[in-house]
């Protein structure tokens, strides 16, 4: 079997869509599973849509996600470089290569110059639509005499170069996900291969590059499926063997419509900025369109490499459910060390005004304890600012009717006084203090279960449910504990 070579070939036109990450990931996993090569090529032939810094941003996103490539465009010390023997790996640097191959197609009659104006093309499309026909090029320039073509070029007329598809012919190819696919050329357009600016279109460049870079499997989104017969035909007339095709299903929202920016986060950068962990996002996005053989849901990258197969990729769209992503991300947050999460959380706490940069050093251990208390509740790291308020206020108000009712219980004054005595007598509020104090109160006063824990929790946090009470007690510390109990005694009971 030939050595597997796959590529991820993004266009530098803006942010990295979550679907692009999945495409890159599937290419990466397939290469790893088959001891192959995973290449990153930049497709920048549409110069009108080029966004400065997009290549660098995309490479940083892939590096963050751990989807690393063996060959192609890399970022070293903020500088774009290329590595590998099949370069250049940036399409705008390959124009002479495309020129060589388009010349061959023209000479052999498989392509032709088209001088039609935009106005004429628009008029043709409008007439076709009005007649209920498929809008496509009408072949007006297909049979222009060579002498006419030469004269128009010499006169400086603008032109594109189109693929000359045969008429009424079925083109077949096999797709690993979809099986046998057949399309008739009567339903296809004479695709533009070279634009008026001299740059190739995607359809021409991708075939030339995939062949010259010896790509064995083209794994890409299903939006390219209708164009694939043109690519297969190009391989045929160029005398090349086509790669194996794999067209991935769309990523859908929970309403089963195509995921779009208007409905929420869709860029990898959105999830990075919120503090999603890379291993969680990769784990989740792998499952959007691919089904493992069992019901396992948590996968390390190594486990994905071992278990992934293209044969288990679905034909139908995969639903992106942010609640499921949050569940997986919360799993990884809980499994992470407090050191890791606190380092990620500090910028969000600073931005929200809970601590200053100057305070971080002396409060670091306390912040780590705080994260230890809260990390089980976090959907993503930035979510910490929605849970820390109770640890920074001097006075806490009950947050629900149930909490207010708990503060009316008859035994509350005696319970709070007993707890306050334990706090005042303690030399240090450490890991052991909370459990020890509660156990002693239970023994001395006879309060136990909800009658013991809930009133103290509400007095300290305003909530009847939450993280482990002894951990809350430790994080609040002696002075906060005293002030909060005192506030409840004076103002709430």
Swiss-Prot record:
Entry binding sites for ATP: 261
Keywords: Aminoacyl-tRNA synthetase, ATP-binding, Cytoplasm, Ligase, Metal-binding, Nucleotide-binding, Protein biosynthesis, Zinc
CC terms in the record's Gene Ontology section: cytoplasm
Cofactor mode of binding and number, as noted: Binds 1 zinc ion per subunit.
Motif ('KMSKS' region): 258-262
Chain location of the short sequence motif 'HIGH' region per the record: 10-20
EC number: 6.1.1.17
Essential cofactor(s): Zn(2+)
Pfam families found in the cross-reference section: Anticodon_2, tRNA-synt_1c
Assembly and interaction partners: Monomer.
Family note: Belongs to the class-I aminoacyl-tRNA synthetase family. Glutamate--tRNA ligase type 1 subfamily.
Protein name (Swiss-Prot/TrEMBL): Glutamate--tRNA ligase
Organism: Alkaliphilus metalliredigens (strain QYMF)
């Amino acid at each position: 079997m030939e050595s597997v070579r796959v590529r991820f070939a993004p266009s530098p036109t803006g942010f990295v869509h979550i679907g692009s990450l999945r495409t890159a990931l599937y290419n990466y996993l397939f290469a790893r599973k088959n001891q192959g090569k995973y290449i990153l090529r930049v497709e920048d032939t549409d110069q009108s849509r080029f966004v400065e810094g997009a290549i660098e941003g995309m490479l940083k996103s892939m590096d963050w996600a751990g989807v690393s490539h063996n060959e192609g465009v890399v970022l070293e010390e903020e500088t774009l470089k290329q590595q590998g023997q099949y370069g250049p790996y940036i399409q705008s640097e390959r124009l002479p290569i495309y020129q060589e191959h388009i010349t061959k197609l023209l000479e052999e009659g498989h392509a032709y110059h088209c001088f039609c104006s935009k106005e004429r093309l628009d008029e043709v499309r409008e007439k076709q639509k009005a007649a209920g026909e498929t809008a496509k090029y009408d072949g007006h320039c297909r049979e222009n005499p060579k002498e006419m073509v030469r004269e128009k070029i010499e006169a400086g007329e603008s032109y594109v170069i189109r693929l000359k598809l045969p008429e009424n012919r079925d083109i077949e190819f096999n797709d690993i996900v979809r099986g046998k696919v057949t399309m008739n050329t009567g339903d296809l357009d004479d695709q533009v291969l070279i634009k008026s600016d001299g740059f190739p279109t995607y359809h021409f460049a991708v075939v030339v590059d995939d062949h010259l870079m010896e790509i064995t499997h083209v794994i890409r989104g299903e939006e390219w499926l209708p164009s694939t017969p043109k690519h297969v035909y190009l391989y045929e007339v160029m005398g090349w063997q086509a790669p194996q095709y794999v067209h991935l299903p769309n990523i859908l929202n929970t309403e089963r419509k195509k995921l779009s920016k208007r409905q929420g986060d869709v860029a990898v950068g959105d999830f990075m900025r919120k503090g999603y962990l890379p291993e969680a996002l990769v784990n989740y996005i792998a499952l959007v369109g691919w089904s493992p053989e069992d019901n396992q849901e948590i996968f390390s990258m190594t486990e994905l490499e071992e278990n992934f197969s293209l044969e288990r990729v679905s034909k139908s769209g995969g639903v992106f459910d942010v609640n499921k992503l949050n569940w997986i991300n919360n799993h990884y947050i809980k499994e992470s060390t407090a050191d890791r999460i606190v380092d990620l959380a500090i910028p969000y706490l600073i931005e929200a005004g809970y601590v200053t940069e100057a305070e971080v050093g002396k409060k670091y251990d306390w912040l780590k304890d705080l994260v230890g208390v809260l990390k089980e509740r976090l959907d993503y790291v930035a979510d910490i600012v929605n849970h820390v308020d109770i640890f920074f206020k001097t006075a806490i108000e009950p947050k629900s009717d149930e909490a207010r009712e708990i503060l009316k219980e008859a035994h509350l004054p005696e319970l709070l006084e007993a707890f306050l005595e334990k706090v005042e007598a303690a030399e240090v509020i450490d890991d052991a203090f909370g459990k020890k104090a509660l156990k002693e109160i239970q023994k001395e006063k006879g309060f136990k279960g909800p009658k013991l824990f809930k009133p103290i929790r509400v007095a300290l946090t305003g909530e009847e449910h939450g993280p482990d009470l002894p951990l809350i007690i430790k994080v609040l510390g002696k002075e906060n504990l005293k002030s909060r109990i005192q506030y409840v005694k004076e103002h709430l009971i």
